[in-house]
A protein has these predicted regions:
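Short acidic, low-complexity intrinsically disordered linear motifs used
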Residues: 1-11
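Active-site and NAD+-binding cores of ADP-ribose-processing enzymes
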Residues: 11-142
Length: 142
């Protein structure tokens, strides 16, 4: 069972980012809506709180654009430095910092985190950003 301090520490960064950005995050993608396909934190829609970082990802795409998205309130998000994230990675035979460019690996990581009750994952690095596993939990802002 988590201590009160662990709960505060794990929840606070995501909560802070969510409130600071008023639930609005950015995505650099191709004009057809495709991202880079790296999948470091699992499979889903990747976002960042940095519009300049999103622009860098857009610049690497064919006819890249930056889109804004509103993220649904109340999602349970895994910090990539948390014990739960480490547990999910350990279940896949990896250390928390060891990741793969494999889509299959990203799919397995997503499954592990979903089994632990998470809707997505995040890093404190704007290049790694945030992944929301289910697109129903984000809405594009036109």
């Amino acid at each position: 069972m988590k201590t009160y301090q662990q709960f505060l520490t794990e929840a606070s960064l995501w909560d802070w980012m969510y409130k600071k950005n008023k639930a609005i995050f950015y995505r650099g993608e191709s004009s057809s809506g495709k991202g880079m396909g790296i999948g470091m934190l699992g499979l889903g829609i990747y976002l960042t709180w940095s519009d300049s970082m999103a622009q860098k990802f857009a610049d690497k795409q064919t006819k890249g654009v930056v889109q804004s998205f509103k993220v649904k309130r109340g999602l349970k998000m895994a910090d990539n430095t948390s014990k739960d994230f480490a547990k999910a990675m350990a279940n896949l035979g990896r250390k928390p910092w060891e990741w793969s460019h494999s889509k299959e690996f990203s799919g397995f990581l997503t499954g592990e985190l979903k089994q632990l009750g998470y809707d997505g994952a995040y890093s404190d690095n704007p290049a790694e950003g945030i992944v929301i596993f289910d697109k129903k939990n984000v809405k594009e802002i036109k």
